[in-house]
């Protein structure tokens, strides 16, 4: 509502529209900064943490996948796949990107 009053006063006082356009540009810049820090920056941090997790994986680590599978890494291939041992008789190949988190040692034995 105050925007209309400012416009009415500007017309009466004969001021130019340049001050109004500066405030519009200022609000757009503030909006873009808020958008960046609320959406893009957290996603970049999350991607960086996930990349560090993937690079730190070694044979014998116990992990959980995006689909909820718990297993021990048996083999890591050079082309980005992991042989995951779910139990003594079941092994699956999965893409490294599907690893969500690293579990503490001995988690699989306690289940």
Curated annotation (Swiss-Prot):
Per its UniProt record, what Pfam families does this chain match? Answer: YajC (PF02699)
For this UniProt record, give its keywords in alphabetical order, as a comma-separated list.
Answer: Cell inner membrane, Cell membrane, Membrane, Protein transport, Translocation, Transmembrane, Transmembrane helix, Transport
Naming one, the record's GO cellular component terms include:
plasma membrane
Write out the annotated subcellular location: Cell inner membrane
The record lists the membrane-crossing segments as 20-40
- The answer, when asked if Cell inner membrane is one of the entry's keywords, is yes
**Presence of keyword Transmembrane:** yes
**Which top-level group of life is the source organism from?**
Bacteria
Topology in the lipid bilayer is annotated as: Single-pass membrane protein
Gene Ontology biological process terms, A to Z:
protein transport
Q: InterPro entries from the xrefs? A: Preprotein_translocase_YajC
Q: Which family does it belong to?
A: Belongs to the YajC family.
Function statement: The SecYEG-SecDF-YajC-YidC holo-translocon (HTL) protein secretase/insertase is a supercomplex required for protein secretion, insertion of proteins into membranes, and assembly of membrane protein complexes. While the SecYEG complex is essential for assembly of a number of proteins and complexes, the SecDF-YajC-YidC subcomplex facilitates these functions.
Subunit structure, per the record? Answer: Part of the SecDF-YidC-YajC translocase complex. The SecDF-YidC-YajC translocase forms a supercomplex with SecYEG, called the holo-translocon (HTL).
Q: What's the protein here called?
A: Sec translocon accessory complex subunit YajC
């Amino acid at each position: 509502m105050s925007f209309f009053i400012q416009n009415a006063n500007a017309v009466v006082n004969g001021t130019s529209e340049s001050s109004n356009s500066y405030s519009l540009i200022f609000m757009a810049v503030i909006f873009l900064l808020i958008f960046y820090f609320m959406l893009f920056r957290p996603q970049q941090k999350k991607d960086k943490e996930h990349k560090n997790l993937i690079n730190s994986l070694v044979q014998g680590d116990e992990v959980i996948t995006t689909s909820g599978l718990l297993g021990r890494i048996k083999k890591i291939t050079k082309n980005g796949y992991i042989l995951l041992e779910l139990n003594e008789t079941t092994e699956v190949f999965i893409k490294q990107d599907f690893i969500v988190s690293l579990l503490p040692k001995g988690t699989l034995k306690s289940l």
